[in-house]
């Protein structure tokens, strides 16, 4: 019997609610597929601030390092916005990524056939969308030095940031994208701004160099402004999108809305070795917390992504994804997906229960 240790970070807002659903689903898959999941819950984000004064306690980080995978629900709350930056929940997430040496964010965007009408775009535009955004996570303008603010008599207040990438940083994220592309349609679109930015010129050079090791992969390039337009005009043209931290932050959120709800989207943050962090794209949604209104499907799909990418439990992952499609195909919806009120509306717990029934063939 396969055995895996998972650190579960339930976090803030709707995090505990969707975590309960994820644990029940793992229990169902454990029984069906003879897999042992040892789940260790640890405080993180605002939850950890309340308990320890820190968003990422050392004990939590150590548990994550000792795990096979980390499953994160959601963090953040406006009540922490006035704290010093290093004590906010979001800084805890940055420190977790740094502590686990995670540099690649993988965000799949797939249109589930039962939800085509939920998208704000026409069905003929989005019906075949199945793409993945591979975003570099630890370099670029968010981390470049120098950065800061200064006051001058001539110009008044002045702020500055530095966008910088090295060969090594580009090469390793490119390898992630090319390896992923080999398991898909063998197409990569690298997004940059090489017409005006030196850092993007280096990015393009290194990505072209990386392709030499993958002659069967079709590589194209788009400037980020054009790519933003193409994602809305013809999103099905994309297979794997490779891009830098800043551009990926923007492009991945735009791509997220192709599905009609951010409550449907999983993601993974990966390094070269060690455990990855698997989490929904959505935030902690404190306005609907504790009301049984949250859509747990992004958390459930993150669990499936963890099973496939982090734990190599391919059959269990496919089983879970098929169960989700089966439930959606029956017309069950959480409130964020029930726009036309023609489907059966479920709460967070009830949606989880229906997916467990589908796993068990009911």
Swiss-Prot record:
The keyword Transmembrane does not apply. Pfam families: Iso_dh (PF00180). Coiled coil: none annotated. NAD(+) binds at residues 283-295. Pathway: Amino-acid biosynthesis; L-leucine biosynthesis; L-leucine from 3-methyl-2-oxobutanoate: step 3/4. GO terms for cellular component: cytosol. This is 3-isopropylmalate dehydrogenase. It comes from Prochlorococcus marinus (strain SARG / CCMP1375 / SS120). The gene is leuB.
């Amino acid at each position: 019997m396969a055995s895996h240790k998972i650190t579960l970070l339930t976090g803030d807002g709707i995090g505990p609610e969707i975590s309960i659903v994820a644990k029940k689903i793992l229990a169902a898959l454990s029984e069906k597929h003879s897999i042992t999941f040892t789940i260790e819950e640890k405080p993180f984000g605002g939850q950890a601030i309340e308990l320890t004064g820190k968003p990422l306690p050392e004990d939590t980080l150590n548990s994550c390092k000792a795990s096979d995978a980390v499953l994160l629900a959601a963090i953040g709350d406006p009540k922490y916005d006035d704290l010093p930056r290093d004590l906010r929940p979001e800084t805890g997430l940055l420190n977790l990524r740094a502590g686990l040496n995670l540099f690649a964010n993988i965000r799949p965007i797939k249109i589930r056939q039962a939800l085509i009408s939920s998208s704000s775009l026409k069905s003929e535009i989005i019906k075949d969308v199945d793409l993945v955004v591979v975003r570099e996570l630890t370099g670029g303008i968010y981390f470049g030095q120098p950065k800061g603010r200064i006051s001058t008599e001539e110009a008044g207040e002045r702020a500055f940031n530095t966008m910088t990438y090295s060969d090594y940083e580009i090469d390793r994220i490119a390898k992630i994208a090319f390896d992923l592309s080999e398991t898909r349609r063998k197409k990569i679109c690298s997004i940059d701004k090489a017409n005006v930015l030196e850092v993007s010129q280096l990015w393009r050079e290194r990505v072209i160099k990386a392709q030499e090791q993958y002659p069967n992969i079709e590589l194209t390039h788009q400037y980020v402004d054009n790519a933003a337009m193409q994602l809305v005009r013809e999103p099905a043209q994309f297979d794997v999108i490779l891009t830098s931290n800043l551009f990926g932050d923007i492009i991945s959120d735009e791509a997220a809305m192709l599905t009609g709800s951010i409550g449907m989207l999983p993601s993974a943050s990966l390094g070269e070795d060690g455990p990855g962090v698997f989490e929904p794209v959505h935030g902690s949604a404190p306005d609907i917390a504790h009301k049984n209104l949250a859509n747990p499907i992004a958390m459930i799909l993150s669990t499936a992504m963890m099973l496939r990418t982090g734990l190599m439990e391919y059959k269990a992952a496919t089983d879970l994804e098929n169960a989700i499609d089966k439930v959606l195909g029956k017309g069950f919806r959480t409130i964020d997906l029930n726009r036309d009120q023609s489907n059966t509306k479920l709460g967070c717990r009830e949606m989880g229960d229906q997916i467990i029934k589908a796993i068990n063939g009911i």
